[in-house]
Amino acid sequence: MMRPSYRSPKGAAVDKLDIPQGTLDLMILTILAREPMHGYGISQRLAVLSHDQFRVNPGSLFPSLYRLEEDGKLKADWRATENSRRAKYYRLTAAGRRQLEQHRERWDRVCFAVTSVLEGA
C-alpha cells in the first residue's frame, strides 16, 4: 500500500517538515496512548503517521522521553524487542493521559484559530 505524500498546491514535491516547537511531546504522548513502545518505534510510528513528513532525530526524541519520564508522564521498563534486543519501552501514566488531554485541547484551539485566520484573510 502506498502512503500519500504531500505536494504543494502547484504539485511540486516539498521538503520534509521540521516538527513545530512544542508539539513533539503531544505527538509522543499520542503515540504512546495506543501502546507502549521503545524510542526507535516511536520515531518510526511518527514518520508513518505523518506520511513521512516528520522525522525526529534521537537528539530531540530521547531528551523529550527522559524529561517526560522524570516529570511522571511516562513510565519505562526494559524488555526484549521483536528481534530479541533489549530496549526501554515507554508507556503513559495517569498524569501522562491528563497531560495528553490538555495538550490536545490546546492544539485543537491553535489549529482552529490559525485556520480561521487563513480562511478569513
Descriptions of predicted regions:
Residues 69-86, 91:
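Beta-hairpin "wing" of winged helix-turn-helix
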Residues 92-96:
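Accessory beta->alpha helical hairpin/"wing" motif in late/C-terminal subdomains of nucleic-acid enzymes
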